[in-house]
Amino acid sequence: MTEVVQNVAQTHITVENLNLWYGEKQALKNVSLKIPRNSVTALIGPSGCGKSTFIRCLNRMNDLVKNCRIEGKVLIENEDIYGTDVDVVELRKQVGMVFQKPNPFPMSIYDNVAYGPRIHGVNKKDIDGVVRNALRSAALFEETSDRLKSPALSLSGGQQQRLCIARTLAVKPRIILFDEPTSALDPISTARIEDLIMNLKKDYTIVIVTHNMQQAARISDYTGFFLMGELVEFGQTRQIFHSPREKSTEDYITGRFG
């Protein structure tokens, strides 16, 4: 694996010798990498290679999976998130996640975004500002400002996904994980989400799982290629796509297998 982050101060997430098992099946094998701050890191690889399992390790979503066992370290700003004193609720607030299919709550647009701040104790008088700022950051406010009390499910698929991003932003995370966020969307909605992700990296560290090679090339600064639970190669996206060091990386990128 190629080390690309020379300056430790640039590193936001450090993963050291991460192994994960579902029962007897090992899904991740000795994964180590450093994810730079305020960047977009794309994870690519064939279905079942471990990339979605990996990002769920970054906010301990795999804790919810029966018979899941993890070894190794995940450090966020030098704190081991698998330490015994870690508040997992606070961790998931700081490391937000947007899933493959939009999953708005069955409530109004406004209440979807206000939900997280409310349960985390944000003062009622501040909620309006939080909601509006989150919707603006997700490039959705102009489209919804006159119907914030309308059902979230009345939005289009692309708008629903941006609403889910706004909901994530409303609790002020430091890191945002995206698990194939555009795979269920049309090309126009996909382009808007991609533009949004590239804009958000100014304020957040972003890790995205994608099966879309062109998408990874368009929006990411760094790319990791997973195969059979192993991180085969990690580097700057330009290097991975134009001069990969590993033959399996080249074969995957050029479509020889998938």
Curated annotation (Swiss-Prot):
Catalytic reaction list: phosphate(out) + ATP + H2O = ADP + 2 phosphate(in) + H(+)
Membrane topology annotation: Peripheral membrane protein
Binding of ATP, residues: G45, P46, S47, G48, C49, G50, K51, S52
Keywords attached to this entry: ATP-binding, Cell membrane, Membrane, Nucleotide-binding, Phosphate transport, Translocase, Transport
Principal EC category: translocase
GO aspect biological process, one term: phosphate ion transmembrane transport
SMART domains hit by this protein: AAA (SM00382)
The keyword Plastid is assigned to this record: no
EC number annotated for this UniProt entry: 7.3.2.1
GO cellular component term of the entry, any: plasma membrane
Subcellular location field: Cell membrane
Alphabetical list of InterPro entries matching this protein: AAA+_ATPase, ABC_transporter-like_ATP-bd, ABC_transporter-like_CS, P-loop_NTPase, PstB-like
Residues of the ABC transporter domain: 13-253
Main subcellular location of this protein, as a coarse class: membrane
Source species, domain of life: Archaea
Nucleotide-binding recorded as keyword: yes
GO MF term set: ATP binding; ATP hydrolysis activity; ATPase-coupled phosphate ion transmembrane transporter activity
Family: Belongs to the ABC transporter superfamily. Phosphate importer (TC 3.A.1.7) family.
Subunit structure of this chain's protein: The complex is composed of two ATP-binding proteins (PstB), two transmembrane proteins (PstC and PstA) and a solute-binding protein (PstS).
The protein's role, per its UniProt record: Part of the ABC transporter complex PstSACB involved in phosphate import. Responsible for energy coupling to the transport system.
Protein name: Phosphate import ATP-binding protein PstB
Native species: Methanosarcina mazei (strain ATCC BAA-159 / DSM 3647 / Goe1 / Go1 / JCM 11833 / OCM 88)
Source lineage: Archaea, Methanobacteriati, Methanobacteriota, Stenosarchaea group, Methanomicrobia
